[in-house]
């Protein structure tokens, strides 16, 4: 696997990145960092112009997440800065373990409020240039723009 182009940017912004493997296997599936109570793992696919989100996992006890989208927002910022605005975040939507939120409701959120496209059942794609902060998303919602 090639060197991940996002790691230098993420490191400069205070994150510690490491290889992501499945159950400790020696084969890397991508890279990962932890932020705001979540572990986010991804891999960059240059040919497809996408950042594939491999895993989002709660790493702290469920005490409420400060911002459940902080890790995704950070990854999108890195992709936009390093790869350019025409790359996409891509991944399968599933709720975090122990969440009372349904997968259908989370999928609706991604479609309605973020503008993500559902390419096939449960698989979403969102251009990194369209990613906005949670506070801006709430402002859009409150002003009727979402």
Curated annotation (Swiss-Prot):
Pfam entry (one): LcrR
Keyword list, A-Z: Calcium, Plasmid
InterPro entries recorded: LcrR/CesD2, T3SS_LcrR
Domain of life: Bacteria
Function field: Involved in the down-regulation of lcrGVH transcription in the presence or absence of calcium and is necessary for lcrG protein expression in the absence of calcium. Plays an important role in the regulation of the low-calcium response.
Name of the protein: Low calcium response locus protein R
Organism: Yersinia enterocolitica serotype O:8 / biotype 1B (strain NCTC 13174 / 8081)
Encoding gene (name): lcrR
């Amino acid at each position: 696997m090639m060197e991940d182009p996002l790691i230098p940017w993420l490191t400069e912004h205070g994150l510690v990145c490491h290889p992501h493997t499945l159950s400790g296997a020696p084969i890397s599936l991508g890279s990962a960092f932890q932020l705001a109570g979540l572990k986010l793992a991804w891999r960059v696919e240059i040919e497809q112009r996408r950042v594939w989100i491999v895993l989002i996992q709660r790493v702290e006890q469920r005490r409420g997440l400060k911002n459940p989208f902080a890790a995704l927002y950070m990854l999108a910022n890195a992709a936009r800065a390093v790869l350019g605005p025409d790359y996409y975040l891509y991944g399968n939507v599933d709720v975090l373990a122990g969440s009372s939120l349904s997968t259908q409701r989370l999928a609706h959120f991604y479609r309605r409020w973020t503008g993500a496209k559902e390419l096939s059942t449960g698989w979403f794609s969102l251009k990194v240039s369209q990613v906005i902060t949670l506070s801006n998303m709430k402002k859009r919602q409150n002003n009727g723009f979402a």
